[in-house]
């Protein structure tokens, strides 16, 4: 896993690339690692997340997003979410984007803009 710490509009961001995140525990370790490096705004790519993240019945998305909130971080997940037909997932994405702590976006540039707005 690669964590690239950068500055954008005077704010510290972490962009995570590399191996998939296979569990909520791995996600927590990643979040803590980024925060330890001074980045409270984190970008990950949807294809890094376990497929069950996008099946809300598993509770994995809620568990990971709760950790983002608990540690007062902000997260952007970059990907094409139109491929998911679940109405509940689309509603979840809409509500998350509305609140702004976790954003589901189409590009890294959009992620940076949302996180640093």
What is each model feature region?
Residues 2-117:
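Amphipathic, Lys/Arg-enriched alpha-helical "gate/interface" segment within cytosolic domains
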């Amino acid at each position: 896993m690669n964590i690239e710490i950068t500055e954008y509009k005077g704010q510290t961001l972490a962009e995570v690339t590399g191996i998939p995140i296979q569990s909520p525990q791995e996600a927590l370790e990643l979040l803590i690692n980024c925060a330890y490096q001074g980045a409270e705004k984190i970008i990950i790519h949807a294809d890094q997340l376990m497929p069950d993240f996008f099946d809300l019945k598993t509770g994995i998305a809620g568990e990971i997003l709760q950790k983002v909130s608990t540690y007062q971080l902000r997260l952007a997940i970059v990907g094409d979410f139109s491929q998911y037909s679940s109405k509940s997932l689309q509603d979840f994405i809409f509500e998350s984007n509305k609140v702004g702590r976790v954003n589901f976006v189409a590009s890294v540039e959009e992620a940076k803009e949302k996180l640093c707005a």
